Amino acid sequence: MSMNRREFLKTTAAAAAASAVGISIPSEAKAAAENTQAGWQWDKAVCRFCGTGCGIMVAVKDDKIVAVKGDPESPVNRGINCIKGYFNAKIMYGADRLTQPLLRMNDKGEFDKNGKFRPVSWKRAFDEMEKQFKKYYNELGPTGVAVFGSGQYTIQEGYAAVKLVKAGWRSNNIDPNARHCMASAVVGFYQTFGIDEPAGCYDDIEITDTVFVWGANMAEMHPILWSRVSDAKLNNPDKYFIVNLSTYRNRCSNLADMEIIFRPNADLAIMNYLGREILKRNAVNWDFVKKHTIFATGHADIGYGMRNPNSPHVTDKERDTVAKQVAKVVTEEEAVALSPIGKWKAGDEMQMTHTAGKKPFWHWQISFDDFKKAVEPYTLDYVAKVAKGDPDESLDSFKRKLQKLADLYCDPNRKALSFWTMGFNQHVRGSWINELVYMVHLLLGKQSQPGSGAFSLTGQPSACGTAREVGTFAHRLPADMLVGNPKHRKITEKMWKIPEGTLNPKVGSHFLKIMRDIEDGKIKWAWVHVNNPWQNTANANHWIKAARTMDNFIVVNEAYPGVSARVADLILPVSMIYEKWGAYGNAERRTQHWRQQVTPPGEAMPDLWTIMEFSKRFKLKEVWKAHPQAKLPSVLDKAQAMGYDPEMTLFDVLFNRPEYRKNFPWPDPIAKNPQTGKLHANTEAGGDGRTIIGADGKEWKGYGFFVHKALWEEYRKFGLGHAHDLADFDTYHKVRGLRWPVVNGKETKWRFNAEYDPYARKYAKPGEKFAFYGPLLKALKRGDLKGPKTKQKYSLKNKAKIFWRPFMVHPEDPKYDTKGYNFWLCTGRVLEHWHSGTMTMRVPELYRAMPEALCYMNPKDAKELGLNRFDLVVVESRRGKVKARVETRGRNKPPRGLVYVPWFDEKVLINKVCLDATCPLSKETDYKKAAVKVYKA
């Protein structure tokens, strides 16, 4: 059979499409498809990108991935991918892939911070890395070093990193970029339920009849989930109702039945309006509320997570905004919102007296009458006035929408499914707004039920599975345990077989504070894993300058030369997703594993290998000694009593354990491909056929045991019996993921509901359906809206909290700006690119589809400024400025007074402009709001 390229592409595409829908395939097309796939080895894997957790199938031939398709057996995506998903393979084959360690050196071959990058051996790289680490570790102690972790870590990578940093170095200065995306959601879960992660699952999409999308452009950021929402809507167009609530019009608006454009930060006011309406309409599910909830509130004067304005690093331009960290003038609209507290009037100066330490977290139980009093000022007239976000929409129209919103939530015959992502989480009151959406659902009793619940969507592929569940945050340990809890530290030390007292009880620096600590000279050695912090952190000019000009040493694990790699002193080339074994956990608590499919290029090695190899460089006597700076005693005597010699390395104690070698040999039957029976490679366990000279100067041949399985089986023990139960390693390689807790081989779809959750059945009272069994923060003092009144704490076992939190104005609201910064700036992602674009900008098809970041602007604003479409403009804030081209007809349509600039483009490094204010509870940065000027370049 003879066939040209065009005919071949046509027939293979037709064959694939026909097969997908069950149509018989012409023999010629079938033969063409079979010929081209000869010798391909298929295996299941997980998408590298967002937190949806789509299953994919990858095909390998001659040690290269030659095809990717959606996994038809995946219950998440059911065989389809989004545009990024189809290019999972191409991200690995960019022309400038890093394949050798690179160290800044002078002409003499010595490390020089101002030198040029030159290739070095792995041994030379680790020698310099060790030298610099020990210099600063001995100078500053455990608090002087840090690791920037990731929500894109595999679970095993994150677990190994936590062991090295917290058990090995006795530092808690490890924090993931998930701090930027999910920390507010975590605080909302902890504060409300006492345990992290969503109660529901993706099945809710098809079961519900009402979807509320709050600050979540699902059509671009979670496109596969949006396709499921779309399908459900099209199958039941008259009943299924979608509301899109956003600060600008986006692609979700196209399908939505109603769109509400609100003023940035005013979601707080809308939630309070809903709370008031639920009471006024007698829509409270009193049986649910009385049995399963209590009411609570906390302090309002908590600041905005900014630096002290007296810091020498705060510039004159920044100071007026940063001053609000200490005190602010209460506006007239805030005076109404805060009036139930009875402390502040319009024009008063609010001193931020509850900013330090745990004070922003303090909360106490209040009565229902106090709660009712608190929401009373949030009338339709008041909220419509403060919350309307589109100047061109009439007030009456906005009011009608708010009333319809309340109708939908309060309708007893409707289910209610609320989704959100960064619009809630990246928010100066992100923890509050998370608490308030639960307030609405709990009052209605529409929580933890099929089709009804408040559902936080995750942005990254393992922000849940690794960052949160493993505990790669500065304050966490595995399975929702906390470094500040003596009982939790003791459990962890026992599990890790390390001396009692090894773990540092003091919470480490969060992601943004690590940057500030580098600028302050408090941290002088930092290691970046699986993220791009010098592009993804707000107020980037400060952090880039500090990294490049101060006395410090920055190591970056990278696959491509992005912004952070170019800022670094040492770059370590690392494997990408299908060049290593791994596991991710997605937004519905589904854990999924994959096998290594291909060999990494050049000398690139897995992140896990770099962590374990670096652990060989530390003897116990160097790290488990006394650290006066951190007030940590020596645990060497206890270590010797456990049989550990001070000359042993952290590798010996943490990773190269005898039980690992005995119980998890390599090769392992689970590593055989289900289709061909061939053994998959495992770079860490047995080498991968390359001749790699390792960190010790010897040829790398593997650890000789199944590292990933050993780490998994140890890690999963943390959650067994504690409502975080995970299945064994082999099971995950036989299924398309499981939603934890996995008890007796069965996954859990809806948590806290005794009909579906074995832990809810265990803890619920006889005859009751729900038990909110999370153990954290389940004893509170009692008081009123002004503060706690009792010294005693009262148990809230198995109950959730209904919070009241007030509306407050953002610290950089253009409405109150007197310096000419008259536009809101919002930033975020786009469909075609992932985060900082380091991977996706190297895929030709994705680059062509979206080659640069644009400044999306309302046409009326553009006309007023004398701007035409695609004109080059300057977007300037108090912190910095960038140039971008104006787009007035694009997919994102801001109201007048707001511009949207995505952050995937390092040439439009918008984080130089963004404000580094955070939610004071979660420490998550508010990337969605800053005051800017826009003018022609």
Curated annotation (Swiss-Prot):
PROSITE patterns given in the database record: 4FE4S_MOW_BIS_MGD, MOLYBDOPTERIN_PROK_1, TAT
Major localization class: periplasm
Modifications the protein undergoes after translation, according to the UniProt entry: Predicted to be exported by the Tat system. The position of the signal peptide cleavage has not been experimentally proven.
Binding site for Mo-bis(molybdopterin guanine dinucleotide): 84, 152, 177, 181, 214-221, 422, 426, 532, 580, 607, 827-836, 911, 928
Catalytic reaction list: 2 Fe(II)-[cytochrome] + nitrate + 2 H(+) = 2 Fe(III)-[cytochrome] + nitrite + H2O
Intracellular or extracellular location(s): Periplasm
EC number: 1.9.6.1
Pfam families: Molybdop_Fe4S4 (PF04879), Molybdopterin (PF00384), Molydop_binding (PF01568), TAT_signal (PF10518)
GO molecular function: 4 iron, 4 sulfur cluster binding; electron transfer activity; iron ion binding; molybdenum ion binding; molybdopterin cofactor binding; nitrate reductase (cytochrome) activity
Cofactor(s) required for function per UniProt: [4Fe-4S] cluster; Mo-bis(molybdopterin guanine dinucleotide)
SUPFAM superfamilies listed in its UniProt record: ADC-like (SSF50692), Formate dehydrogenase/DMSO reductase, domains 1-3 (SSF53706)
Cofactor note: Binds 1 [4Fe-4S] cluster. Binds 1 molybdenum-bis(molybdopterin guanine dinucleotide) (Mo-bis-MGD) cofactor per subunit.
Sequence ranges assigned to domain 4Fe-4S Mo/W bis-MGD-type in this UniProt record: 40-96
GO CC term (a single one): membrane
Family: Belongs to the prokaryotic molybdopterin-containing oxidoreductase family. NasA/NapA/NarB subfamily.
NCBIfam families assigned: NAPA, PRK13532.1, TAT_signal_seq
Quaternary state and interactors: Component of the periplasmic nitrate reductase NapAB complex composed of NapA and NapB.
Protein name, entry field: Periplasmic nitrate reductase
Organism placement in taxonomy: Bacteria, Pseudomonadati, Campylobacterota, Epsilonproteobacteria, Nautiliales
This protein's encoding gene: napA
